[in-house]
Amino acid sequence: MMTRRRLAVAGAAALVAVVALLLGGVLATSPAASPAAPAAAPVRVLAGLSPGGTAGLVSRLEVKIQRNPSDVKSLATLGLAYEQRWRETGDSSFLPLAAHALRNAHALSPNDPLTTQGLGSLALTRHEFGRARVLGRLAILLAPYSANPYGIKGDALLELGRYPQAFAAFQKMVDLKPNLSSYARVSYARELSGDLPGAITAMQMALDASAGDREGYAWSSVQLGKLYWMRGDGRSAKRLYDNALQIFPGYVYALDALVPVEAARGHLRRAIALEKRAVDAIPLPQFVGQLGDLYARAGQPRLALEQQATVRVIQHLLGFNGIKVDLETAIYRADHSIDPAGTIALARKGHALRPSILGDDTLAWALARGGRCAEALSWSTHALRLGTHDSLFYFHRGTIEQCLGHAASARTWFARALALNPNFSVRFAPVARRSVS
């Protein structure tokens, strides 16, 4: 069994780049996925609530706190429920409300474990990773036999590039409570360490651990499907996404995950329709961005540009509500060749706060798009230091080699990206194919 033995992650310390929301959610299973989304391995404090159930809980708690403003448990739970509402709706205005409730709870009871964990979760959500690390350590002191605080601490350490320490935190987490959340982190660690078969095994365990939890099952199915998709197995990926939608109709992360599968099959109109459904439900920037790429591929440049404008608005709103999205914004700008000099500056700022492999690759990509390819090469090498098999990382490296005039090396990296998944990106897989040919 995996539950009591050491986590076997070949070749590197484990890395799990996730935002730990105590209310559940989804784990971003690719380093290039946008953590501005409400993305996390579920740590299920308010498990089992439907979106309507969470809204009702918020209303009841608000009334309760009006009657008794000193109710610490209700304040902390309200803060967590506001975070849940953000996850369910994509409306980042819930996050200042969460912060207000949790700060009030903390002022009344500085050593309350649930409040401290909630503040740590919120810090991760806002990409305040240094603060999240401190809060995670404090949460462990307050509740040393609870697994959740180790998730907060580990997630923060990972984003700070502290891989051995993060691995130790997650080892403790899985030792204390082997469950969906722990297994998901094992899976992601193995994925980023280049062990996709091991990642699939661990995510299957997460799926098996989700029995009785509809959202947990849908979430795990999508993550498992994405692992199959990463290695080019579209049939298995589609089966798992369809399973998620059967259990949880309209599940937006399954709708979005189906999009590249349908696009790869040549069903571009269906892919656009699926992404529009996801965007209409929760307008996350990565959903809108992919919709724009689909429109561009379909020969509809006006609609593609409209999505770019929408992404800018969403990113502005996220920043206004306290989420640091420098890296996500830099990735998007670099992808679309928007203001190369400004994008490099933004990538440097994001990397300083978040020196993970995602930060390394983002900086490398921004530098490459700005023509500073010698410096980009160094950061690309650093981004690949864990042995991660990621087609976008490979594509970025190929572009850098091409920029430096290393034609043979560039073709090798493009071929590696396509060998892993010939349809790794709606936008860039065709570019890689042309470069190889």
Predicted features along the sequence, with ranges:
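Short coil turns that delineate tetratricopeptide repeat
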Residues: 69, 110, 144, 177-178, ...
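TPR alpha-solenoid repeat register
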Residues: 74, 115, 149, 182-183, ...
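Structural motif corresponding to the intra-repeat A-B loop/turn of tetratricopeptide repeats
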Residues: 85, 89-92, 126, 160, ...
